[in-house]
Amino acid sequence: MADVYLVKAVRPRYDKSESLVNKIPELMEKAGIKDVVKDGDVVAIKVHFGVRGGYRIIRPQFIRAVVDVVKGLGGKPFVTDTWGLNHVYDAYYNGLSYATLGAPVIPANGIKENDFRVVKLDEYYWLSEVEVAGNIYDADVLINFAHAKGHGGAGYGGVIKNIALGCVTQRTRRAQHSKEREVGVKAFHEAMADVVKAVLSNKQGKVFHMLWIMDVVEHCDCTAFGMIPLVPDIGVAASKDLVSIEKAGLDLINQAPSVPGSVADKYGLKPGENKFLRIHGRDPYVQVEVAEKAGLGSSQYKLIEL
């Protein structure tokens, strides 16, 4: 069983010290960031840059708070995502830059997605080789800062998807999606687990996961639009266990009431329902199950609210 820490979006009083952004340092400290980031470490902060037209990505001030924590520990952070140089322009358009974040914003696998390291797996579901983004592979530490939201192919995109589809080359992304078309959704989830295993293969004890459970919409951040969040903002979670934080995030979303006027109205979603299964017809908990089976973490967790 792993600990998952949560700072809730609803704060107990109107005070600067209770700001969700200002609680990020405490959240990261409680979740064990000091065990992960050491003085001199080069730290990749993996987020989704979004695209032009979309506006539900993690807000810059939250990423800046993570950058500042890393700097305070002597780390050398950079903020990153794949898709090459064009995606960096998307990041700038969406307000993610050195000026706003206090760290370089660079493509994870080069300006044309040609910078990668081939990682071979001895045990895998479908993919024996994975092309890991070079800057992710070379970094000493990976902070996996994901946005909890829906995903048309996987049903849900959280910390697993942020690595599986966001830390590799276009060829590896296509290899995962092809399993959905050729075999089925579970095979897609299994291929994602293969990729996560490969990406984290040289990061033992040097990975930290964060989940922004805010603006929880039914679509991915790669879409050029934004819809009304389907549940109220829940908060920000952190853990050193990938599977535990993913399971906790899904549970919190499913326990939450729906937001009137959102896609939840169309499906009549109620607290306790598997919301993304209803919306996309794909069970996101399969991601959790296959990742746990692959040895990537535990689905048993203890939720600790700060």
What are these regions (language model features)?
Residues 2-54, 58-63, 67-306:
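Extended, low-polarity segments enriched in aliphatic/aromatic residues
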